[in-house]
Curated annotation (Swiss-Prot):
Species, as recorded: Ovis aries
Protein name listed in UniProt: Keratin, high-sulfur matrix protein, IIIA3A
Keyword Nucleus: no
Transmembrane segments: none
Keywords: Keratin
Tissue expression: Wool.
Tree of life domain: Eukaryota
Organism phylogeny: Eukaryota, Metazoa, Chordata, Craniata, Vertebrata
Function: The keratin products of mammalian epidermal derivatives such as wool and hair consist of microfibrils embedded in a rigid matrix of other proteins. The matrix proteins include the high-sulfur and high-tyrosine keratins, having molecular weights of 6-20 kDa, whereas the microfibrils contain the larger, low-sulfur keratins (40-56 kDa).
Amino acid sequence: TGSCCGPTFSSLSCGGGCLQPCCYRDPCCCRPVSSTQTVSRPVTFVSRCTRPICEPCRRPVCCDPCSLQEGCCRPITCCPTSCQAVVCRPCCWATTCCQPVSVQCPCCRPTSCPSAPRTTCRTFRTSPCC
């Protein structure tokens, strides 16, 4: 019970079940098992958590990387560098340039990029877009 977000709390503070910290600044924002919506801080009580998620971004800076659930947008500083799979939310993109990584729909590109949907992003030296 009580707020479980902040530098002095861990994922265990909000009922456990969080596999890893969400963001460096918000270590235990969690998604309830029964809920499919993003939970914003402060989280007052979560009996069980699945995968950790970040509070919604004010701007779509990057996609939800790696194993996090769809619908979470995190600041670029929170994105792990070891990620290969990227799960996107609408109007979020991992980077402004193409990366050789697989993406899942729905995914949208920067405004300067073509709108045609693709499942694989490749890097081209002559173009900053996918």
